[in-house]
A protein has these predicted regions:
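Membrane-interface aromatic/basic loop that binds lipid-linked glycans or pyrophosphate carriers
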Residues: 45, 71-134
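Amphipathic alpha-helical repeat scaffolds of TPR domains
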Residues: 55-68
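Residues within HEAT/ARM-like alpha-solenoid scaffolds
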Residues: 30-34, 49-57, 79
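Amphipathic, well-ordered alpha-helical segments in soluble domains
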Residues: 35-38, 61
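A conserved position within tetratricopeptide repeats
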Residues: 40, 44-47
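General small-molecule cofactor/ligand-binding pocket signal
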Residues: 4-6, 53, 96-98
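Nucleotide-sugar-dependent glycosyltransferase catalytic core
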Residues: 3-35, 72
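Short, surface-exposed loop/turn segments at secondary-structure junctions
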Residues: 22-23, 48-49, 75
């Protein structure tokens, strides 16, 4: 098997509505975390020097799913919510120190550590701002 991990931002995405990345949460989306968890174990075992990059990728997968969950009415009641939220809160300081994450995402991790509602408020405000740009 051959894997390549790269975290350098070579380009910017324009997110279309109703694409896979912008659709609402479904239980299938949790596969994204499961895949990156398996990938992370492999990388940690065979390429431990890529620990920071792999932590970034795995944590990003959790953020991706968490952001989707926060758009669901009654998200607090979903079983996936607790798993994802717990991971991000437990790793918030490590995320905040990881220089691969953009500054905004590092700050968001700290907001989440303080309060999920604060994180959600900032996330939704950022989404509204981004939609105005496009």
């Amino acid at each position: 098997h051959k894997y390549v991990v790269n975290t350098k931002p070579y380009y910017f995405y324009y997110h279309r509505g109703n694409s896979i990345t912008t659709s609402t949460f479904s239980k299938r989306d949790f596969n994204y975390i499961e895949i990156y968890t398996k990938f992370s174990r492999y990388v940690e075992e065979h390429y431990p020097d890529l620990h920071e990059e792999m932590f970034f990728r795995l944590s990003y997968a959790y953020f991706f799913i968490f952001d989707k969950l926060l758009h669901v009415d009654g998200y607090q009641k979903l079983e996936e919510y607790k798993v994802v939220c717990d991971y991000l809160k437990q790793n918030a300081l490590k995320i905040a120190r990881n220089q691969i994450f953009q500054k905004g995402r590092r700050l968001a991790a700290l907001f989440l550590k303080v309060n999920v509602r604060l994180y959600r408020f900032v996330m939704l405000a950022n989404e509204r701002k981004t939609k105005q740009i496009h």
